[in-house]
Amino acid sequence: MKFELDTTQGRARRGRLVFERGTVETPAFMPVGTYGTVKGMTPEEVRATGADILLGNTFHLWLRPGEEIMRKHGDLHDFMNWQRPILTDSGGFQVFSLGDIRKITEEGVHFRSPINGEKIFLDPEKSMQIQNSLGSDVVMIFDECTPYPATEDEARKSMQMSLRWAQRSRDEFDKLENPNSLFGIIQGGVYEDLRDESLKGLVDIGFDGYAVGGLAVGEPKADMHRILEHTCPQIPTDKPRYLMGVGKPEDLVEGVRRGVDMFDCVMPTRNARNGHLFTTEGVIKIRNARHRDDTSPLDDKCDCYTCKNYSRAYLYHLDRCNEILGARLNTIHNLRYYQKLMEGLRGAIETGTLDAFVEEFYTSQGREVPEVPELTD
């Protein structure tokens, strides 16, 4: 992987990630394909929304279908028929989410399979081996997602163990002679000094990119912004910056303003299945009876397949009848909305009009533009 940085406006960055399997324009949003599929979508449909790269879930693909079946197909690209870049998470966050059915030690994590209750052990070495089998273009280190709330001492111990796991991940990745890219994950909770220590340790080890982890786990939005404002400028300029698991459209806008290059989140697809649809004027709840006889499209500024062909009334009807097509059309729209937002952000950075773009983004929804500190490096 090669990261090319074209231009900046404030801290916002316009560039691209160049892989053998294709180029990813940044800032970029990655749809989530947890089980080797973006729910309800074919790869061709996902690509048509403007997606250049997908996120796969190491933990779930390891449990089902497993490495052996994956290898029989070649790798995850062949298994799901997506011949473009794929980033896989390490499984650390999913283990974190298991709560009481897992036990974290220095060696790794012991837990019971959420599928059949089988006892399973996952450590940095195994995570690297699984992601190698998946053929991931971007491999994430195995780390512990620091919970919120956590005391500074708790966050320090978690972060320092994640640093030791980062070294083990790097060593195993190199041992496997994996030709792809490995990203480090900055931890430290809401404590700036711990974020500094984490980043320094990761840079000393050396990675192809750096993710900001452990955010969007329940902390106030102001804390997330503060950590991004503090941490992003310290990440090496020539490396991509990835904010994991984020988020709402406004979170992407605010992340880009603070120097983030990559995002992923289940929100556009999950919300689509629940009838919550993103538009330039705000969120539409298609289950609301007000849409029952509305012949207008979801968003007259959207160029997606759904908006060009179907009315709000039809989408309301599909939802009321629990038709699968409704969830699919909603997903197409939400994913296109996210990709169009990223296209707009990229174009605004290129032309030096980011401030005007951000103002239009908020005012078109009847919202005030959030103030941002003077973001100069």
Curated annotation (Swiss-Prot):
<protein>
    <recommendedName>
        <fullName>Queuine tRNA-ribosyltransferase</fullName>
        <ecNumber>2.4.2.29</ecNumber>
    </recommendedName>
</protein>
<dbReference type="InterPro" id="IPR004803">
    <property type="entry name" value="TGT"/>
</dbReference>
<feature type="binding site">
    <location>
        <position position="307"/>
    </location>
    <ligand>
        <name>Zn(2+)</name>
    </ligand>
</feature>
<comment type="similarity">
    <text>Belongs to the queuine tRNA-ribosyltransferase family.</text>
</comment>
<keyword id="KW-0819">tRNA processing</keyword>
<feature type="active site" description="Proton acceptor">
    <location>
        <position position="89"/>
    </location>
</feature>
<dbReference type="InterPro" id="IPR036511">
    <property type="entry name" value="TGT-like_sf"/>
</dbReference>
<dbReference type="InterPro" id="IPR002616">
    <property type="entry name" value="tRNA_ribo_trans-like"/>
</dbReference>
<dbReference type="GO" id="GO:0005829">
    <property type="term" value="C:cytosol"/>
</dbReference>
<feature type="binding site">
    <location>
        <position position="304"/>
    </location>
    <ligand>
        <name>Zn(2+)</name>
    </ligand>
</feature>
<keyword id="KW-0862">Zinc</keyword>
<feature type="region of interest" description="RNA binding; important for wobble base 34 recognition">
    <location>
        <begin position="269"/>
        <end position="273"/>
    </location>
</feature>
<comment type="pathway">
    <text>tRNA modification; tRNA-queuosine biosynthesis.</text>
</comment>
<keyword id="KW-0808">Transferase</keyword>
<comment type="function">
    <text>Catalyzes the base-exchange of a guanine (G) residue with the queuine precursor 7-aminomethyl-7-deazaguanine (PreQ1) at position 34 (anticodon wobble position) in tRNAs with GU(N) anticodons (tRNA-Asp, -Asn, -His and -Tyr). Catalysis occurs through a double-displacement mechanism. The nucleophile active site attacks the C1' of nucleotide 34 to detach the guanine base from the RNA, forming a covalent enzyme-RNA intermediate. The proton acceptor active site deprotonates the incoming PreQ1, allowing a nucleophilic attack on the C1' of the ribose to form the product.</text>
</comment>
<keyword id="KW-0479">Metal-binding</keyword>
<dbReference type="InterPro" id="IPR050076">
    <property type="entry name" value="ArchSynthase1/Queuine_TRR"/>
</dbReference>
<keyword id="KW-0671">Queuosine biosynthesis</keyword>
<feature type="binding site">
    <location>
        <position position="187"/>
    </location>
    <ligand>
        <name>substrate</name>
    </ligand>
</feature>
<dbReference type="GO" id="GO:0002099">
    <property type="term" value="P:tRNA wobble guanine modification"/>
</dbReference>
<feature type="active site" description="Nucleophile">
    <location>
        <position position="264"/>
    </location>
</feature>
<feature type="binding site">
    <location>
        <position position="143"/>
    </location>
    <ligand>
        <name>substrate</name>
    </ligand>
</feature>
<dbReference type="GO" id="GO:0008616">
    <property type="term" value="P:queuosine biosynthetic process"/>
</dbReference>
<dbReference type="GO" id="GO:0046872">
    <property type="term" value="F:metal ion binding"/>
</dbReference>
<dbReference type="GO" id="GO:0008479">
    <property type="term" value="F:tRNA-guanosine(34) queuine transglycosylase activity"/>
</dbReference>
<feature type="binding site">
    <location>
        <begin position="89"/>
        <end position="93"/>
    </location>
    <ligand>
        <name>substrate</name>
    </ligand>
</feature>
<dbReference type="Pfam" id="PF01702">
    <property type="entry name" value="TGT"/>
</dbReference>
<comment type="subunit">
    <text>Homodimer. Within each dimer, one monomer is responsible for RNA recognition and catalysis, while the other monomer binds to the replacement base PreQ1.</text>
</comment>
<feature type="binding site">
    <location>
        <position position="302"/>
    </location>
    <ligand>
        <name>Zn(2+)</name>
    </ligand>
</feature>
<keyword id="KW-0328">Glycosyltransferase</keyword>
<dbReference type="GO" id="GO:0101030">
    <property type="term" value="P:tRNA-guanine transglycosylation"/>
</dbReference>
<feature type="binding site">
    <location>
        <position position="333"/>
    </location>
    <ligand>
        <name>Zn(2+)</name>
    </ligand>
</feature>
<feature type="region of interest" description="RNA binding">
    <location>
        <begin position="245"/>
        <end position="251"/>
    </location>
</feature>
<feature type="binding site">
    <location>
        <position position="214"/>
    </location>
    <ligand>
        <name>substrate</name>
    </ligand>
</feature>
